[in-house]
Amino acid sequence: EAMPMIMEWGMGMAGPLIYLEYPFIWLNQKLTFGDTFGLTAVDAINSTDTPVLILHGDEDTTVGYDTVSIISKKNEITNPNVRYLVCDVDRRNGHNSLFYSLEALDYVDEINEIGSRIDERYGYDVPEEVLREYYASVDKFRVRELDRGFMESILTFYRDAVK
């Protein structure tokens, strides 16, 4: 169900004032999604015998691990073909860092620091040519280097699912 997640995000952005917006958010969601508005991921997962892999970082601050994530509803999931893969490795256990190697995350920190220095040098009005040079200097392969062990766990799930 989307409303708890929307409200959690809203609380982070607007604090308790988000509750004043609740009726309008609810109406918008209902008009946008119609009959499917009340469906939940748990209902969908339980309605099938299809293998399902649920991934989550235990320090995810975007989709709260213990609050609104699918994995927080683990005790409601009855599909016996569900597998859970929780990343608890420091720095890789957030929302957007699950798949990347620690080396990639270190490199991203380095290039972000360089980018911050460029921003500060130009007062956040960086000339296009400087931006072009900066982005051209980024090693796209290093930025996206995957954590092989984590990816192997995912591949194992898929290989088992198609047997």
List PLM regions with ranges.
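Short alpha-helix in the alpha/beta-hydrolase fold that links the catalytic acid
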Residues: 50, 64-74
